[in-house]
């Protein structure tokens, strides 16, 4: 598997974890700020997993454009899907 595939896999796993936890942030009782707090929570998760992949593969291994394509995009897509499934009680 190439470097971008490994980065995508790491971020997809992070998306599953943070998407599951995002439901608890959303239902924490923050009123109208719950959606904003959840998106900030997911953004922090993407940054955390970005640092994990940078330390794992080397800081110069991926450009910022590659990280946005193979890291951030899969993270948010997987996290939103898992969040919606958890919110609706399917998982």
Curated annotation (Swiss-Prot):
Primary localization class, coarse: membrane
Record Pfam families: EMC6_arch
Keywords noted in UniProt: Cell membrane, Membrane, Transmembrane, Transmembrane helix
Protein origin, superkingdom: Archaea
Record keyword Transmembrane helix present: yes
Compartments reported by the entry: Cell membrane
TM stretches of this protein: 9-29, 30-50, 67-87
Membrane topology: Multi-pass membrane protein
Claim: Transmembrane is one of the keywords in the record: yes
InterPro entries assigned: EMC6-arch
Gene Ontology CC: one annotated term: plasma membrane
Stated name of the protein: Uncharacterized protein MJ0606
Natural source organism: Methanocaldococcus jannaschii (strain ATCC 43067 / DSM 2661 / JAL-1 / JCM 10045 / NBRC 100440)
């Amino acid at each position: 598997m190439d470097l971008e595939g490994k980065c995508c896999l790491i971020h997809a796993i992070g998306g599953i974890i943070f998407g599951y936890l995002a439901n608890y942030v959303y239902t924490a009782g923050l009123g109208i700020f719950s959606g904003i707090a959840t998106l900030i929570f997911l953004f922090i998760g993407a940054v955390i997993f970005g640092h994990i992949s940078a330390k794992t593969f080397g800081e110069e291994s991926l450009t910022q454009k590659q990280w946005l394509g193979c890291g951030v995009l899969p993270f948010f897509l997987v996290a939103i899907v898992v969040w919606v499934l958890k919110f609706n009680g399917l998982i």
